[in-house]
C-alpha cells in the first residue's frame, strides 16, 4: 500500500527545510513514522519525537528523538544526504508530532498534529486525509 500526499513546490534551504511537492509514503515509511510518533524506549526513557525527514518517493526516512525539554537539530545535512542517496527531493516531514510538509491542506495556521495515543489505523487515516 502506498499512501500519497499530493503536494506542490520545492524545498528551500533559506531556513525552511520543510518538504513540499508530491510525497508518496511507502509502507516502510508509514511504519517508521508511527514508530517515530510513539517514541522508542532508550535507557529506560521514552524518546520524544524531534524531527522526521523523508524523501519525496517515500523510500528513505530518518528521525531523531530528544531526551530534553528542548532540542535544536540541524536537519540540513540530513536532507542533503537524503537527496544525494536517493536522487529525489527530500525535506522535513514533521517536527515533534506536527506535520510540516507543505501541501495546501496542511496550512500554516492549521497544521496536522498526530497523537502518540492514536492507533496505527488512526495515524494512517490522518496521513491519507492529507
Model feature map: region roles:
Residues 14-130:
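Secreted/extracellular ectodomain signature
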Amino acid at each position: 500500500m502506498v499512501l500519497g500526499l499530493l503536494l506542490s513546490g520545492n524545498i528551500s534551504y533559506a531556513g525552511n527545510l520543510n518538504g513540499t511537492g508530491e510525497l508518496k509514503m511507502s509502507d516502510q515509511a508509514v511504519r517508521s513514522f508511527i514508530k517515530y510518533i510513539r517514541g522508542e524506549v532508550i535507557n529506560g526513557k521514552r524518546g520524544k519525537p524531534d524531527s522526521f525527514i523523508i524523501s519525496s518517493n517515500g523510500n528513505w526516512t530518518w528521525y531523531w528523538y530528544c531526551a530534553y525539554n528542548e532540542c535544536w537539530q540541524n536537519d540540513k545535512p540530513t536532507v542533503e544526504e537524503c537527496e544525494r542517496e536517493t536522487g529525489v527531493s527530500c525535506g522535513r516531514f514533521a517536527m515533534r508530532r506536527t506535520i510540516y510538509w507543505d501541501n495546501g491542506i496542511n496550512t500554516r495556521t492549521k497544521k496536522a498534529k498526530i497523537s502518540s495515543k492514536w492507533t496505527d489505523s488512526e495515524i494512517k487515516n490522518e496521513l491519507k486525509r492529507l
